[in-house]
Design a protein with these regions (language model features):
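Short glycine-/small-residue-rich flexible loop motifs, especially phosphate/cofactor-binding loops
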Residues: 98, 124, 211
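Structural signature of tandem-repeat unit edges
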Residues: 1-14, 21-40, 47-69, 73-95, ...
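A structural signal for leucine-rich repeat
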Residues: 172-176
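Short, structured coil segments at secondary-structure junctions
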Residues: 217-218
Length: 227
C-alpha cells in the first residue's frame, strides 16, 4: 500500500507528495503525524476520497482516527472519510463536518448512506456527491442542516428525513468563515443544492420543517408522508 509524504509548515499540511493536482485522487495509506493541526485547501490531501486508510498519530492534539475516518480529537466530529471508512461504527459522532463527503471530482455508480443515529448537525456542504444513484437517510437525531449541506449531482437522488430537522438558508455551518463578498451569494443558497431538481425526491413527515422548507423555497421535490 502506497504512503504519501506530507509537506508541513507550522502545523499546516500544505502539500502531499505524489498527490495529483490535476484531478486524480491519491490512494493508499494517509498517515497524519502528531504535529499536524490543520489542512491547506490547496494541498489536495483528500481529493476524491480514494485513500484506503486514514491513520492519525495518537499523540496528535487536534485530530484522531477510527475505522479509517478522520475525526476531531474527541471523536464527535467527522472531518473526512476515505474509500474504506466505516462511519456506522463511530458511536460518539455528533457532527458531519464541512466537505466530510466530497466526490464531485469523480462520478460513482451509487452513493447509499444512512447517517448514524446520534448525529445532530450536518455542516455546510457536508455531502458533495457526484453519483448516478444517491440515497441519504437522515435520522431523527439530526436537528440542524447547514446551507449547501446536500450538494448532489445525480440523475436519481433520494433524501429521506426520518425526523423534523431544520434546513437552513444562508447558514455557513459551525466553522466556515466566509468573505464579506460571499455573504450575499451564500445567503441565497439552500441546504439542498441540486442542478437537476426534477430527478430529486424527498421523503419526510408531512407536517415537518422539511416539508414547509421545500414549499417555501420552491424546491422542485416531492414530499411524501413517512409511515
Amino acid at each position: 500500500m502506497k504512503d504519501y509524504k506530507l509537506t508541513i509548515e507550522d502545523g499546516v499540511i500544505t502539500w502531499v507528495e505524489n498527490a495529483d493536482e490535476n484531478g486524480n485522487p491519491i490512494s493508499g495509506r494517509l498517515f497524519i503525524p502528531k504535529e499536524v493541526t490543520a489542512f491547506d485547501m490547496d494541498a489536495w490531501v483528500f481529493l476524491g476520497c480514494e485513500a484506503e486508510e486514514i491513520v492519525v498519530d495518537p499523540e496528535n492534539d487536534v485530530f484522531s482516527s477510527a475505522h479509517n475516518c478522520l475525526l476531531s480529537k474527541d471523536g464527535k466530529k467527522l472531518i473526512k472519510v476515505c474509500k474504506n471508512s466505516d462511519v456506522s461504527k463511530i458511536t460518539s459522532l455528533e457532527i458531519i463536518g464541512q466537505d466530510a463527503f466530497n466526490d464531485l471530482n469523480a462520478q460513482r455508480d451509487e452513493f447509499l448512506f444512512k447517517i448514524p443515529e446520534g448525529v445532530k448537525i450536518l455542516d455546510y456542504r457536508a455531502f458533495a456527491i457526484n453519483a448516478l444513484n444517491v440515497e441519504i437517510i437522515v435520522p431523527s437525531s439530526v436537528r440542524a442542516i447547514g446551507a449547501l449541506a446536500f450538494m448532489i449531482h445525480s440523475d436519481n437522488a433520494h433524501i429521506v428525513f426520518e425526523g423534523d430537522a431544520e434546513l437552513e438558508v444562508g447558514v455557513f455551518g459551525t466553522e466556515l468563515e466566509a468573505k464579506d463578498s460571499d455573504i450575499e451569494v451564500y445567503n441565497s443558497m439552500p441546504s439542498i443544492l441540486y442542478p437537476k431538481k426534477e430527478k430529486l425526491t424527498v421523503t419526510c413527515p408531512k407536517d415537518s420543517k422539511v416539508y414547509r422548507y421545500c414549499k417555501k423555497y420552491g424546491i422542485n421535490v416531492s414530499c411524501k408522508t413517512t409511515n
